[in-house]
């Protein structure tokens, strides 16, 4: 199992990321989990490099790599032809953007990015000014988002023989489960986890601005009450799920499975194995 969740790479962030437990991993090797500290930088380019190496190692051992998770760009960086080294650079434009940032502030630059490249804006913290400026630099030069530019949209042999599966359900049921999940996180000690992370890492790092953490940090800063923080987290999670679904729905390679049709997760897993039979598995 190879995680394709951009938040699971961080150590000590367990409850807010719904990190799988040892019991849930059931002795099956899980990769790309707990590999960097929350105050360390970790990029999609680093993810791509590490996972490509992992896939080769797993295949060499005669096993089948399963890429699992919901960070669309992480998945696409591995299965498609993304090149993170060729985006154009313009030193003069970058300096102009830096001067603008000095005048209007990091938050205004992040808002500007959200208007032209919402995907990058969602991924980057407003204080990550270097990367915000880099994404703007690429957009202003090419008219494309940084992800669009990095994707080589030409006819090439696919990197892997693969099958893709997506899980979906009734929207209202999904939102109900999101509310239950947030309540469960709070019951399991999300507030304590965030307090300890802020103390240990001085509240620094892009990771602590991730979904489930920034909302609680807002409460700790006195911006709103704890019940309000919980409601904001539920709202933000619903919005994230909607954007996530929109991203994956655009990929016609995905075979969608309606979870409402199955009694339990085991039945869903059996359906996936049935769909894979003949290509990857001998049942």
Curated annotation (Swiss-Prot):
Cofactor: Mg(2+)
The EC number(s) this enzyme carries: 2.5.1.75
UniProt record, GO biological process: tRNA modification
Keywords assigned: ATP-binding, Magnesium, Nucleotide-binding, Transferase, tRNA processing
Xref: Pfam families: IPPT
Site annotation Interaction with substrate tRNA: residues: 71, 94
GO molecular function: ATP binding; tRNA dimethylallyltransferase activity
Record SUPFAM superfamilies: P-loop containing nucleoside triphosphate hydrolases (SSF52540)
Catalysed reaction equations from the record: adenosine(37) in tRNA + dimethylallyl diphosphate = N(6)-dimethylallyladenosine(37) in tRNA + diphosphate
Residue ranges of the region described as Interaction with substrate tRNA: 5-8
EC class name: transferase
InterPro entries listed in its UniProt record: Dimethylallyltransferase, IPT, P-loop_NTPase
Origin: domain of life: Bacteria
Sequence similarity: Belongs to the IPP transferase family.
Family matches, as HAMAP family: IPP_trans
Function text: Catalyzes the transfer of a dimethylallyl group onto the adenine at position 37 in tRNAs that read codons beginning with uridine, leading to the formation of N6-(dimethylallyl)adenosine (i(6)A).
Assembly: Monomer.
Name of the protein: tRNA dimethylallyltransferase
Source organism of the structure: Desulforamulus reducens (strain ATCC BAA-1160 / DSM 100696 / MI-1) (Desulfotomaculum reducens)
